[in-house]
Amino acid sequence: MSRAGHRIRTERLGAPLAAAVLLAGGLSAWALTGASAQAAPASVDAQDDFNGDGYADLVIGAPNATVSDKAKAGYVAITYGSASGLSTANKKIVSRSTSGIPGSATAGERFGLTFTKGDLDGDGYGDLVIAGGPGGSVVLWGSASGLTGGTNLAGYGQAPQAGDFDGDGKTDLALFAHSTVAGDDPPSAKAALWKGPISRTGTPAAVLNILDKSEWWGYDEDDASCATGGGCEEDGDSISGPIVNGHVGDVNGDGKDDIVQWVYTGDGTWGNRLLIGGASGFTKSWVPGEGASSDVSGTGVGDVNGDGFDDVVVGGDGWDSKVRVAYGSASGLSDANTKSFDQSLPGLYGAEEEGDGLGTAISVDDVNGDGYADIALGIPGEDFSGLTDAGSFALVPGSASGFTGTGSQVFHQNTPGVPGVAESGDKFGATTALLDVNGDGHRDIAVASTTENGDNGAVWLLRGTSTGLTTDSALAFGPDDLSAPATKAQFGTSLR
């Protein structure tokens, strides 16, 4: 079952997000507004709720931050949800210099570049796995008081992903070793599938090869799979990379989560790879954006047309600025069942221009509560009002027929109610995330500008409602507001 399928939706009274920012040009101060009385929160994914209070918690990566005098050592910031939304006072900052976290701050490690959420030990609290490069990943464990502890996953420091990959109802962990681009061919790196539950000492129920035997190969049988024969040259304990990030969902509706990864494909290009979940490891399948671009392209997974199969949404790349939606089915994804759109879609504005970055960031989830996942698109290269690369983001609603453009919304820093003032080079919309931080049953959007305030970075939050996103009581904050390292941190490089 996909992550979306784990949600139990209940209706409750909506409420303001209890935050407004007072700005003039840059981020300088923020003020809270009063919150109205509310009923109990709607149920949310355990993976998003670290303290079990019924509100999703936002994780923010600042991988370029200087920590303990180590440049680009990096950290993550966790801001906990509540009935009134996020508060900069209710937070946790985690780096390699944090007490209880294995290792020490290391220059260039970029701790927090990627991370994943999931209830690994089955206690009902979401846990957080932070990629730590060559130093391995670190697990922080959820509890009634929030994230605690720190368990090292040595040897697996790149783009971990949590999900129920074998369909047994328990959260598994796909782990990948750190690797770097070193030539034209993508290097292979160690990888493993840890079956859940996973204990707080870092011990899984079992360890499987990352790839099913049908994906192994050798020189026997005319270079075919060596699953039933000998002579394997490569088996299932490694996979090509480096892997930059990943997104989880169930594209074929078989009750087993799948992963879409952004990986190095060779000869200077990057692209998507789809791993189909199974009882004995992953198999590979077609996905849009396979090795087609040398530019970073956003990807999101969710059920846009509400048919029970998760769809894969891929942003525009260096060759075109079209967003592609590959609709899921019992047989998975196919080019024939893939549709595309650009900025001429009804409800969007602006001409299709090279460098806009339509879909550089993509998040897919249900904002208005109608049962269809909506598509949030970062457009960080958008030019307007004489400004270059000021940036914007759009929300394209889902429907029974998929995307139509009807009801689409576009926001930037000059939109009334959005804190701040648009400036050239802000690249507002560089990253996005959809999650219900105030528990009203509507996904709210977090959106970042990593270049705000001289590359310090900042994050905005707009509240979701039954009619889409609203700027009422919008919130914006930067690392200074969290008493976190700020200089050149690129706060908001990753959001989840």
Can you describe what each PLM-predicted range is?
Residues 64-69, 134-135, 179-184, 264-268, ...:
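Short glycine/acidic-enriched loop and turn motifs that connect beta-strands
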Residues 110-119, 125-142, 159-165, 174-177, ...:
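Mobile, glycine-rich extracellular loop/lid and propeptide segments
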